[in-house]
Amino acid sequence: MAILTQNLCRYSHTIGFSAQNGRGFNNPVDVAAAPGGRLYVLNRSNIAHAARGILRVSICTIDEEYIDQFTAFGEGDGQIVWPTAIAVDQAVNVYVSDESRHDVQAFDRDGHF
């Protein structure tokens, strides 16, 4: 994890925990930092992991405090197939782009579609 301070980026520490043992990361492809210290980690995982209930967005802090996770594999509203990027705005709305669905979906800070 890098910390941006006055346009300088310095290494702080590595965070992460595997979803193989339940909640955690599985092939993380992007991360977005929100005001207030939350990190939103976008996991690509795969269909087999999705079938086991591994969700696509993990919410944690830089200190590795697990907060929650949201979204599932699928074609419905609030579901994603092949996520490519994640972004957070100042109001802490979370945006996830999906290469397979050709869309960007918006969620609130807690993952509600």
What are the functions of these language-model segments?
Residues M1-F113:
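Eukaryotic scaffold repeat domains enriched in small/polar residues
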